[in-house]
Amino acid sequence: KKLLKNFVFEMPYAHFLGIDATHKNNKLVTILPYSSSLIGNPMLPALHGGVTASFLEISAVLELYWGVISTNWRFSSDQLNRTSSTGSIFHGQIPKTIDFTIDYLRPGQPKDAYAEAEIKRAGRRYASVYVEAWQEDRKKLYAQASGHFLMPNNNE
């Protein structure tokens, strides 16, 4: 769990948005807590599309960290206790986005949002991830995305 919290802490924008992650039913679920500052259209009101896109992309990267990087890389207990003020456990190496396609299915309501990502393919250099986001009802998605990522080299 500490490693998961460190993953979020390593991404400044995720930290800024207040994104958190937890395990539910043996899956990683990313949480975007509602804040009025996330509203893009105050007339509806609806979550800003850029916030939704960022949330989905961060969810994909967290899934890659959790599903691939954390199981293939070995971290000492000293590394796991580091914070960004004392140095990154990842040395700035995060998966780099090659492309990311978002489908906005309905407006995001002024409520907490949840996302779950699934790694479709992960190799040494490339990974493909699919992400779904919902709010109150897991079956009523408000956005979905697919992305391709260049994986970091853990030998550097």
What function would you assign to each model-found segment?
Residues 1-156:
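Terminal targeting signals and extreme-terminal segments of soluble enzymes
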